[in-house]
Amino acid sequence: MINIQNTILGKIVDRKHEELAARLKQRNLQDVEELAKAATPVRGFANALQHKRPGVIAEIKKASPSKGIIRADFNPAEIAEQYEQAGAACLSVLTDVDFFQGADENIAIARNHCALPALRKDFLVDPYNVVEARALHADCILLIVACLSDQQLEEMSKTAFEHQLDVLVEVHDEEELERALKLSEQCLLGVNNRNLKTFDVDLNTTIRLKKLLPASRLLITESGIATPDDVRMMQEHDIHSFLVGESFMKQPRPDQAFTALFGQPQTV
């Protein structure tokens, strides 16, 4: 693990451990398991992503630590509808409150207004958070290698699969990729072009790490995709899956921003 102390990521992770302790007092794991069993059926996240080209995970995000408020007029239901009409394969929904102004209920709100599967975009630190994601009606979870140990990654991905959730494992460099590749091949791999220690963006991060993967392994590029040229650059390197949020969220019509960036994705 990288040293994340004195970074934004470190502050977020510290807050997540505080949140976890508070949530465990409110509702024990057994109760959350019961809620997870009663949740709406899982929609296949990985399957949806693999059957669209380009496969776009479109993000519902109000704010971020680096940019502050990105979208003041924030309506998750309307955004989800627009993304589906534009041709998104999946949704990514921020649930972190303190740093991204997200909310747990936004997953259900978004899913109730479209047929797309949804990723719970948050900084999960314990298997409890994984079960909680299913209870919130998520179809996929995010595991960020930079803030989890190998044991946590293994345990949390296993818990996810036991609850029929897909898993997106996020890496930023070669060392993190090496750790991610120890996990089940069932896991989706995402490369964050944003350095979570400095928040600088470099699109070449995805291209560099793609070369270390078998050609058959699907890779998702995350952060910094802002122009059609950015999309073409990725496609020229056989990268066809994208997670995009800010580029859509800062435009008045996210669906029009989607089309301007990706055109009309095709079902494959």
From Swiss-Prot:
Record Pfam families: IGPS (PF00218)
InterPro entries assigned to the protein according to its UniProt record, in alphabetical order: Aldolase_TIM (IPR013785), Indole-3-glycerol_P_synth (IPR045186), Indole-3-glycerol_P_synth_dom (IPR013798), Indole-3-GlycerolPSynthase_CS (IPR001468), RibuloseP-bd_barrel (IPR011060)
Gene3D superfamilies found in the cross-reference section: Aldolase class I
Record keywords, A-Z: Amino-acid biosynthesis, Aromatic amino acid biosynthesis, Decarboxylase, Lyase, Tryptophan biosynthesis
E.C. code: 4.1.1.48
BP terms from Gene Ontology: L-tryptophan biosynthetic process
Catalytic activity annotation: 1-(2-carboxyphenylamino)-1-deoxy-D-ribulose 5-phosphate + H(+) = (1S,2R)-1-C-(indol-3-yl)glycerol 3-phosphate + CO2 + H2O
Keyword Amino-acid biosynthesis belongs to the record: yes
Domain of life: Bacteria
An example molecular function term from Gene Ontology annotations: indole-3-glycerol-phosphate synthase activity
Cystine crosslinks: none
Pathway assignment: Amino-acid biosynthesis; L-tryptophan biosynthesis; L-tryptophan from chorismate: step 4/5
HAMAP family tied to this protein: IGPS_B
Family: Belongs to the TrpC family.
Protein name: Indole-3-glycerol phosphate synthase
Organism: Acinetobacter baumannii (strain ACICU)
Encoding gene, per UniProt annotation: trpC
